[in-house]
């Protein structure tokens, strides 16, 4: 069976790859959007923190016998804690300065982290086994859907929507937004604003680490796994709107699908299609599809 002259199995296979990539685009851009939207910091360390998540899971499995499910719980906390240290010791000095200072600092930190892991582990990838419960695939009738990839898509969607709900629809989210816009007023109500800011950054970093754990069984774990991805994720955030939570989610999944379809119909453009879209969006709507002009 063919669709638009393309074998249906090839088309749906690329759509699946697009959804998988979109799941990671959404998770990572969500973390970036949370950090920028609430803290006004462009966190270029995000790709390295994604890599850290994959490595903590891999080291936990090989050195401590930590299974996948425990890694899903422990890794975001461990890597998020490193984010808390970074925020308290470095980033808090930059909140009132231009975005460029935060960008340069986090870019430098990313290079340091990546360099340390490359020196220790080399550049070759290391496998992380798919959990036994997710081995095998579902036969949908027109394609085989690997169970683990189905889990990643569903879990990413649930995590993204849950984060959006907490930030946009709960009292905690209202406090977070208010602390960004008027910290003195929020502090007057007895809320520890510096602690909220620190935990928010730690949460955003934890999302990157969680994405790293989920990516480990799909992509090989290596020190450069976040280096190229972070450029794409920044483009996703810009297209969706800097600081827009829903923009990060919708744009992440949407661009993953567009990228997958491009590989079917015009493979040569698949590596640049997201950046072409970013250029068009910046020309037509500089604040992003879901962003608001300030």
Can you name each region flagged by the protein language model?
Residues 3, 38-85, 89:
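Membrane-embedded helix boundary and interhelical linker motif in transport proteins
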Residues 10, 89, 120, 181-188, ...:
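Cytosolic-side transmembrane-helix boundaries in multi-pass membrane proteins
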Residues 65-109, 116, 250-251, 255, ...:
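Alpha-helical transmembrane segments within multi-pass membrane transporters and channels
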Residues 25, 65-77, 198-208, 212-213, ...:
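Transmembrane alpha-helical segments in multi-pass inner-membrane proteins
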Residues 93-169, 196-199, 261, 268, ...:
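Transmembrane helix-bundle core of multi-pass membrane transporters
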Residues 1-28, 56, 64-71, 98-101, ...:
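Membrane-interfacial amphipathic/re-entrant helices at transmembrane-helix boundaries
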Residues 21, 143-221, 245-251:
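Helix-loop-helix "hairpin" substructures at the membrane interface of multi-pass membrane proteins
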Residues 54, 58, 76-82, 107-117, ...:
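Hydrophobic core segments of alpha-helical transmembrane domains in multi-pass membrane transport
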């Amino acid at each position: 069976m063919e669709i638009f002259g393309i074998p249906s199995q090839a088309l749906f296979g690329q759509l699946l790859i697009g959804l998988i990539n979109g799941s990671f685009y959404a998770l990572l851009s969500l973390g970036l959007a949370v950090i920028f939207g609430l803290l006004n910091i462009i966190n270029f360390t995000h790709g390295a923190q994604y890599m850290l998540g994959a490595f903590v899971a891999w080291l936990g499995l090989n050195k401590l016998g930590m299974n996948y499910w425990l890694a899903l719980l422990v890794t975001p906390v461990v890597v998020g804690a490193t984010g808390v240290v970074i925020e308290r010791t470095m980033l808090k000095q930059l909140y009132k300065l231009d975005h460029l200072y935060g960008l340069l600092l986090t870019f430098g930190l990313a290079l340091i982290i990546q360099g340390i892991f490359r020196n220790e582990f080399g550049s070759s990838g290391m496998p992380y086994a798919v959990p036994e419960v997710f081995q095998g695939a579902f036969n949908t009738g027109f394609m085989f859907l690997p169970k683990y990839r189905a889990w990643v898509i569903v879990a990413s969607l649930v995590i993204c929507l849950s984060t959006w709900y907490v930030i946009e629809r709960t009292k905690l989210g209202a406090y977070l937004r208010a602390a960004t816009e008027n910290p003195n007023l929020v502090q007057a109500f007895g809320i520890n604003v510096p602690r909220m800011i620190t935990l928010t950054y730690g949460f955003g970093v934890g999302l990157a680490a969680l994405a790293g754990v989920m990516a480990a069984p799909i992509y090989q774990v290596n020190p450069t796994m976040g280096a190229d991805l972070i450029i794409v994720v920044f483009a996703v955030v810009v297209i969706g709107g800097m600081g827009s939570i829903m923009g990060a989610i919708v744009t992440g999944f949407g661009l993953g699908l567009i990228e997958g379809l491009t590989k079917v119909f015009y493979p040569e453009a698949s590596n640049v299609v997201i950046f072409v879209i970013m250029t068009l969006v910046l020309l037509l709507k500089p604040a992003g599809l879901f962003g608001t002009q300030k």
